[in-house]
Amino acid sequence: MAKIHVVMNRKGGVGKSLISLNMGAVCADVRGTRPDGQPYVAVASADPQGTALWRAARLAVQPFDILDIADDIENIALMKQLPYAHIFVDTPGWAEINPETGLDPLGEDKYGRILRALLDQADDVIVPVITEVDCYEPTWQTIEWVLKPLGVPFQVVINNWPPAEGIAYVDGTRGWCEDHGYPVAQTVIRRYRVHTNATRVVTQYNNNRVELQAREDFYRFALEHGLRGAETRLPVQAGTDTEAVEA
């Protein structure tokens, strides 16, 4: 039975596609292939923009299978039955809908239904956050309005940090997560041009200093994600965090 790892944040531009593809690549590298030579790992795209599909198409060699599920809501319930050990799912952002209005915070359109179907299947959710204060509120909404009410285990990861800007931005973002009681990875995924060039996944990077460092971030996060395990992430809490999001 496949383990489903959903990469989700209401905010766009936080690196969901990057993380989905590279976590899939690392997992495929470590897991190897089945006796028939097929991969144990797939990356699925539920994003209508198709960023993960575009990036995967640019790879000379795909170490995983790539699945387009953006128009396939009927079969999402069957994903665990697919012949993979792990499936990493790239998801779209969505518009702000306050549940206090009585509406579903994911919305009622096709993609809201797809996100709900994915969360029904998810073993865990990876929530990328960047070190910018305008990312805090959508991250809070993703966790408080969606993940915690559904009881889905999750882990926040700080992504796309430019080291030249200083560690204070990481410390501030980590502190915000910890103040809200959100489990946040010790690994920080740094920003590198080799990531944004989108012609290779980290398992295909060269053995020079910069590309080794870029690759290391994802191997470290994959190890940390696996060691924590879905059952050890945030326990379901009664109620939600109602404090205003502070910059």
Language-model-detected regions and their locations in the chain:
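Conserved Switch II/interswitch segment of TRAFAC-class P-loop GTPases
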Residues: 94-98, 102, 106-108, 119-139, ...
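Switch II (G3) loop of P-loop NTPases
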Residues: 45, 81-115
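Phosphate-binding loop that captures ATP/GTP phosphates
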Residues: 30-82, 186
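Walker A/P-loop phosphate-binding motif and the immediately C-terminal alpha-helix
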Residues: 2-45
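Conserved beta-strand segments of the P-loop GTPase G domain that flank and frequently precede/overlap
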Residues: 44, 89-90, 126-130, 156-160
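Beta-strand-loop-alpha "switch" segments that mediate conformational coupling across diverse proteins
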Residues: 161-207
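NTP-binding/hydrolysis catalytic cores, primarily Walker-type P-loop NTPases
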Residues: 202-247
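Conserved C-terminal guanine-recognition region of P-loop GTPase G domains, centered on the G4
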Residues: 133-159, 163
